[in-house]
Each structure stands twice: as structure tokens, then as C-alpha cells.
Amino acid sequence: MNSYLLAFKSGFGFLSTIPVGISMEGIDELMKKIYFYPVVGAVLGLLIGAVAFIGQVIFPGPVLAALLMGFIYYITGFNHLDGITDIGDGFMAHGSLEKKIKALKDTTIGTGGVSFCILLLLTLYGSIRAVQQEGSAVFGSNLPVLMFESMFIAEVSAKQSMLTIAAFGKPIPPREKQAYPGLGAMTINGATRKNFLIGFVFGAIVCFLPFGWIGLLPYLGACLVALVILNRSYAHFGGLNGDGIGTANEIGRVTALIILAVLLQLSLNGYMGGFKWTLL
């Protein structure tokens, strides 16, 4: 199989539950061409957006928000959400760097992990509802289209957040101490500046298409939040691992939706100035 097709296919095996099959050869190709992360995110975003579009026509808002959350994790899996719980335990652990890393890698879930996970899920639900409510006031009958495009941008932003945090991070343990690097370290090692820029430009283009310049704001916001997560990971653990990358995915998605909701609120109140909303 062509190396690009293998990397693209492996992206779905690695970042979703779509049963395309995955092998170490495929993972190696994906890590060499890790700019496929936002490309895979775009395809997943189309699927999630389609469910949002159809669901907005059929279901009441709160029901659709809950169903959308279920579909997001049905199609993307819970691996990245597990990263939130591990990061939460590590952040809440007291003591030395070694104790924090031990809590990070502990397979049991503590209070910090449970709390972080609950807060993330509540914020995801709230951000979807906020886009629905503010979007209904701004776009009226075009709300299903808005929901489609918002969920699309959120998923592209989530995957580019992973690429962003990996591109600027250093692995735990350092490369020179890695006998057999894990998937997190492989992601960091593959996220070169070149691969980051290719993915970033692709993500910016596809997020520009639905809303024009406004579509870039949630995308850029998610990438900036990924760097904040990286900063906190350095402060607590002295580096980055797969849990931090997964956390960037989850928080990046929520960040994009929150920014979209805020922009809709500002638009409703007449504070958007010369910026105009566009719908494909």
C-alpha cells in the first residue's frame, strides 16, 4: 500500500474506533506523516457534524447535546478521555516530580482524575448547548447548518491541538532514556516543525471555509490552549506524555466550541464590529 494511504488509514485506526485495522508499520508511517491528524479530524468532524445536522432537525436541544457527546466518544473512543483522568491525578498529587509522575502513570483513578473528567464532560455538554442557544438566536432556521459546521471545526481543532502540543513538547522520559518509546513519545518524535506547519495550514484552511475569518478564532484558540496544557505538564512532570496529548484533544474540542458560543453571543449583542458570519 502507498505510504500516504497507509498513514491516512492508520490515522483512523489510531484516532477513532472505525475498524480499518492497524499495524506497527502503519503507526510508523502515521508518525512520519503526523500532519494527517487534522485531516483525520476533518473526516471525523464531517461525520459528527452530519449527526449534529440531522439531530438538530429531529431532537430537542438538550437531548441532541447528550446524543452528540455519546456519538463523539462512540466514534473517537475513550482513550483520550482516559488521558484527562491520568493528568488530573498527576496534577493533584503532592510532593516531588517523581511522585507526580507515578500518580500520572498509575492505572487506578483517583479523585483528581474523576473530578477532571466530570468537569470536562460537563463543559462539553454546556458548550454544545451554548452554541445551540446562541446560534438559534443568530441564525434561526439555519441552526442545523451552524451545528454541522461548529462540530466540524471543533474536531479539526481537537486534532490540531494534539499536533501542536506534541510539536513543542519533550517526552517523558527523555529521548536518550527511551529503550522502546511508547505511542506518546512516538507522537512527539514525529511532530517535527515541518509536519506541524503542514497540519496547521491544512487545519486553518478547512476551518476558514465554513465561517470565513471567524472560523479561524476557535481553531487558533484551541492551539493556544494546547500550549497552556504543555506549560502545566512541564511544571508538574518536567515533560509530556501521551496523557497530555490526549488531554489537549479533549480540551481543544471544548475550547473551540466555547469560543464559537462566545462569538455568537457577541454577535447577538452587536459587538462583532466588521466581522461577518458566513455559512457554507
From Swiss-Prot:
Biological or metabolic pathway of the protein: Cofactor biosynthesis; adenosylcobalamin biosynthesis; adenosylcobalamin from cob(II)yrinate a,c-diamide: step 7/7
Domain of life the protein comes from: Archaea
A cellular-component GO term for this protein: plasma membrane
A GO BP entry: cobalamin biosynthetic process
Catalytic activity: alpha-ribazole + adenosylcob(III)inamide-GDP = adenosylcob(III)alamin + GMP + H(+); alpha-ribazole 5'-phosphate + adenosylcob(III)inamide-GDP = adenosylcob(III)alamin 5'-phosphate + GMP + H(+)
UniProt entry keywords in alphabetical sequence: Cell membrane, Cobalamin biosynthesis, Magnesium, Membrane, Transferase, Transmembrane, Transmembrane helix
Predominant subcellular localization, coarse grouping: membrane
UniProt entry tagged with the keyword ATP-binding: no
Keyword Secreted: no
Cell compartments where the protein resides: Cell membrane
Topology in the lipid bilayer: Multi-pass membrane protein
Family: Belongs to the CobS family.
Protein name from the UniProt record: Adenosylcobinamide-GDP ribazoletransferase
